[in-house]
């Protein structure tokens, strides 16, 4: 299958799924990386800019460069993107889990806890506004 067909099929599947559950728009985290950039493009193609809500959710492992990339992506796509820090929420988890897991803050578990904090924020927004959360992940998550 060629890449354009694959992309079109993914956009159609995403649209069918969200519309099938009665979604009134989508929310996603914008990290500035390839995965969230591709998914943001798919969401805009499926739902239009007015129905895509992006959030930059920096934490202790985030770089300023990634936030600049996320802002540029949002600007290029014509979607609004808000910045909400998850640093305080992460610190609460870190303080509790560090008692159970040595070197928690320097581990994959620590980095992935940052992703879980982001998911909590995105799910809360989705539930509150009636949006559908669209998420990305990789093998380590």
Where do the model's predicted regions map?
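Structured core elements
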Residues: 27-29, 38, 53-56, 80-85, ...
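A conserved beta-strand->alpha-helix junction
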Residues: 51-56, 64-106, 115, 140
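Aromatic/hydrophobic pocket-lining residues that form π-stacking "cages" and hydrophobic walls in ligand
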Residues: 14, 70, 122
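Residue-level signal for inorganic ion chemistry
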Residues: 33, 74, 134
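ATP-dependent adenylation/pyrophosphate-handling site
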Residues: 24-30, 34-71
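RNA-binding accessory domains that recognize and position tRNA/RNA substrates
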Residues: 1-27, 45
């Amino acid at each position: 299958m060629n890449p354009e067909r694959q992309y079109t099929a993914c956009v159609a599947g995403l649209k069918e799924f969200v519309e099938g559950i009665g979604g009134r728009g989508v929310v996603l985290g914008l990290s500035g990386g390839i995965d969230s950039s591709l998914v943001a493009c798919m969401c805009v193609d499926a739902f239009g800019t007015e129905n895509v809500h992006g959030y930059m959710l920096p934490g202790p492992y985030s770089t300023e460069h990634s936030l600049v990339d996320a802002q540029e992506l949002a600007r290029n796509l014509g979607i609004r993107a808000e910045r909400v820090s998850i640093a305080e929420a992460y610190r609460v988890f870190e303080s509790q889990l560090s008692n159970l897991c040595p070197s928690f803050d320097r581990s994959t578990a620590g980095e992935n806890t940052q992703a879980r904090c982001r998911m909590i924020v995105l799910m809360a927004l989705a539930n509150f506004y009636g949006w559908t959360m669209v998420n990305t992940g990789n093998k380590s998550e």
